[in-house]
Amino acid sequence: MLSAFQLENNRLTRLEVEESQPLVNAVWIDLVEPDDDERLRVQSELGQSLATRPELEDIEASARFFEDDDGLHIHSFFFFEDAEDHAGNSTVAFTIRDGRLFTLRERELPAFRLYRMRARSQSMVDGNAYELLLDLFETKIEQLADEIENIYSDLEQLSRVIMEGHQGDEYDEALSTLAELEDIGWKVRLCLMDTQRALNFLVRKARLPGGQLEQAREILRDIESLLPHNESLFQKVNFLMQAAMGFINIEQNRIIKIFSVVSVVFLPPTLVASSYGMNFEFMPELKWSFGYPGAIIFMILAGLAPYLYFKRKNWL
């Protein structure tokens, strides 16, 4: 899908992108999973080559941040959650050339959707491609900050469940949720660090106008403030995981202790019953009129004796 936007009084407005409408007036070309015809149109009308899927997947810095005859290129991660609430990072290719911003991505992303909604009612300050790029990065950082806050909130709820829970199913569910939150936190951190690298490259290589240079530095400061919070999330997750595993081990030990005590308590009565169950010819107790009730009483006493002993030693 191809979308194009132009500036009118420093405010983004969408261009109709039918075949008859040229793209030359667009300041922002946004492509989501473009087909061959859309790629060819951008190439023929604007002379811009677009990144391929293998190029989007490259992770080395030289393939993600570079400048060539086709413009300034930045490939950056954007965080998303799909319909099934599975988190991930999707690479977006940014290219700035001749005062125009090209964005190429493989899916719809929350940061882009939020920025387009804001752009309907907010005017840009300088109205250039660099400001567009930095505004998108700024929206991304806001989204990541919200995600960190959501993880904090979820961890607080899990902390109460783990510290107050007394059922094994609660701990199992808590461990599963903790693993999921740790995965989300790792993806958020990866996105923050990747954005930090992209902005550092932009500050070093691009001749940013004064307003955009300060904007880039402000976003970098925001990232620096978020990274320690993100790191503390991992510490909290690890603590809660260890606490949950500790409580699970305590519960398992309690169950094992119960079975051990039961087996020890029933071992002496079993020995008594086995003794009187032997078929020898000379067993005087067999002829006693109180032999059977006496054996039953003996078995009960044999079971009570170790139980009372364990109680006295506070082993139960």
Curated annotation (Swiss-Prot):
Residue spans, topological domain Cytoplasmic: 1-254, 311-316
Catalytic activity: Mg(2+)(in) = Mg(2+)(out); Co(2+)(in) = Co(2+)(out); Mn(2+)(in) = Mn(2+)(out)
GO BP term, example: magnesium ion transport
Family under the similarity heading: Belongs to the CorA metal ion transporter (MIT) (TC 1.A.35) family.
Record motif Probable selectivity filter, residues: 277-279
Parts of the chain that traverse the membrane: 255-273, 288-310
One Pfam family this sequence matches: CorA
Main location, first listed in the record: membrane
Localization of this protein: Cell inner membrane
Oligomer status and interactors: Homopentamer. In the absence of Mg(2+), interactions between subunits are weakened, and dimers, trimers and tetramers can be observed in vitro.
Keyword RNA-binding among record annotations: no
Any one of the GO CC terms: plasma membrane
Official protein name in the record: Magnesium transport protein CorA
PANTHER family documented for this protein: MAGNESIUM TRANSPORT PROTEIN CORA
Gene behind this protein: corA
Keywords assigned by UniProt, alphabetized: Cell inner membrane, Cell membrane, Cobalt, Ion transport, Magnesium, Manganese, Membrane, Transmembrane, Transmembrane helix, Transport
Membrane found in the keyword field: yes
Residues on Periplasmic side: 274-287
